[in-house]
């Protein structure tokens, strides 16, 4: 099954005031026990195109493997008040495999000029995905943006805390 996400689906997690939005930000290809994310290239204003993201209620680790393109996998762990406690970014290139721990939030960001294609090893039921903190705060603690041709991080003003960004 193929699901296409539209600019309307993504608007609630983008920086406030964004006008130019990628029409079809990403697609999901679901089959048996896996999902392929196909994230379109482009920008939503100055923010790189991304997936909506979610916090995982899945009891185990999830494996993400980049099949094509380049981008960033964002991971965030919140405290009990839904404030960011840890923020980690992992650079994605073809064949890169990333494990996302239980209870962490994740989002895929396409920083390249081609599609970003990423495989997840599990199909999650709606009960396994918690989007509420992301929707309430319009995204994760930082937005991934382009400034002067470089990848940069802009603080999301809806968070009180902005932890140090760690990379992998």
Model-identified regions with their sequence ranges:
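Active-site region of the double-stranded beta-helix
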Residues: 1-91, 109-168
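Histidine-centered metal-chelating micro-motifs
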Residues: 96-98, 102-107
